Amino acid sequence: MLIVVSPAKTLDYESELPALKTTQPRLLDDSEALIARARQLSPADISSLMGVSDKIAHLNAERFSLWERPFNKKNARPAAFAFKGDVYTGLDIESFNDHQLSEAQQRFRMLSGLYGVLRPLDLMQAYRLEMGTKLDNERGKDLYAFWGNTITELLNKDMKDAKTDVLVNLASNEYFKAVKKKAVAGTIIEPVFQDEKNGNYKIISFYAKKARGLMAAWIIKKGLKDPAKLTQFDVAGYCYCEAQSTALRPVFRRPEQG
């Protein structure tokens, strides 16, 4: 199985890192083209385009300005250790041993508006450029047009290298829209996480994001290869709900937390 998740807005470039053998993102020429376009934006443009505060807009204008190749351990950080949102709280990459990190490097991918596809140990310079951003560019009106088939083709290559024909989508709709579903060389499984609230089960964003990270870590640490065994996921109080599930859309539910 190859797992895909969304990136996070919150970044950590401060905390101590273990000794890691890092890799380079594989689509940096594309990233460089996007950076050149983003550098044409004023902080006011960024604020309007991304719907962010002036402070965040200025920070990201500075990030675009400072972005430079080559990436090294002084100016960049391994992607899975840099992202710090809810998905990554669930993932808890710091708890992975060397074998598990190696497994993640082969089977875990982060989609990115700037970098396209990232492996856990790919070095990444700080940025904010969400996939849904309507940034017109040399290839079209937005980032979906910019990335075209590139992301899908790289995921297909990664699936082939990992000897799997199953893609587990743990990303948001905004990000997975960058994947051409009909061109994926295999089966797409899209787990759903629902929490009980006032007697009803529904997707609660904060919990669902964390659950996606929990499932990704669970798959990697167990070395799971058979997608049929995804139904055994039972972390943090979630359990498989057969009545609500289909083979390609397994549903996991958790009773209301006391």
Curated annotation (Swiss-Prot):
Any one GO BP annotation for this protein: response to hydroperoxide
A GO-annotated cellular component: cytosol
InterPro entries named in the record: YaaA (IPR005583)
Stretch forming the signal peptide: none
Domain of life: Bacteria
Pfam families (UniProt xref): H2O2_YaaD (PF03883)
Family that this chain belongs to: Belongs to the UPF0246 family.
Designated name of the protein: UPF0246 protein ABO_1338
Natural source organism: Alcanivorax borkumensis (strain ATCC 700651 / DSM 11573 / NCIMB 13689 / SK2)
